[in-house]
Amino acid sequence: MRKKLLSSLLVTAMAVTMLAGCGSNGGQQASTPATENKTETSAEAKTDDTAGTDTASTTTTEGGKIGVAMPTKDLQRWNQDGTNMEAQLKEAGYEVDLQYASNDIPTQVSQIENMINSGCQMLVIASIDGDSLGTVLEQAKEKDIPVIAYDRLIMNSDAVTYYATFDNYMVGTKQGEYIRDQLDLDNAAGPFNIELVTGDPGDNNARFFFGGAMDVLQPYIDAGKLVVKSGQTDFETVATANWSTETAQSRMDAIISANYADGTKLDAVLCSNDSTALGVTNSLEANYTGEWPIITGQDCDKPNVKNMISGKQSMSIFKDTRTLASKVVEMVDAVMKGGEAPVNDTTTYDNGTGVIPSYLCEPVFADASNYKELLIDSGYYTEADLK
């Protein structure tokens, strides 16, 4: 059973998403390219964001047509998710319409509407904002088009058939446990200073990440073993709109200036993912002169793995998108053939209309001691990628 903190965060999530409304943009990422009003192309096709809408495959196949909607090409992980899924679906005999929406909600809504009207028989959607797709998905429901929410749960829509993701609560607990173990919180005298940085408030996953980590760390904060010098501990305060590197960096700049400029030691920064960890690292390099703190992350993006190798980031949760893509292809194939998708969780993920049957893949963490085995030996990256 999830603990009280996670339950509280999810109640808050429901309130936030109800207030967000359809089409709410929630603030866009500061690093968004100037051409982001354009529809992004398939990562397999042109990578120029000005290239316009791209249908990833136009060849008719016997398997049927699957629409795959990804949020943005701004983050490396979504490129990998999209291309991995596209390749595996094509290999399984399906035509694929893969679209990226440049983190623009109206663009994603339009892309999904086009998928519905162009004959897609099933949709796989990684939403930009979990509460923004209810209206367009009513159209999918009316046409009996099954929907798999991919990695981000789509909220308040009974059109969602399945959810495929990694165990997001476990992601957070692994990050919290890493900090606990590295600081030896059960034995060391302390106190230790920590700051907290999590993700987009419109992304339901961010609350699971933060909830899992805080279920590990909160007892040490309550006991005074961990001290948040900034005083910023509630989810809404430590959230980072659009997981923006620049936003995380600006916030960390202010925290360092107010709390650590006098030489006070910062021992750890809980970062829920790699884009926020990169912002924290950039800020520390520019503003912090003390001993380097523990920094967590998630996704094993190339710049962050390079930072792990050089000692600037301590760890990153590795979510092998090939594994998730493979599972989604299994789910799609089962449903398209008239069966039920394989799931392993039927209790955890309630999107406001009921519990969504889910398949959860298990994450692992990478650090300087095991990244070669996890990332290079497995073929996820080459050594040249990390030079």
Locate predicted features.
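A residue-level marker of the well-folded mature domains of exported/periplasmic proteins
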Residues: R2-L5, M18, C22-K387
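Hydrophobic core
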Residues: L10-M18
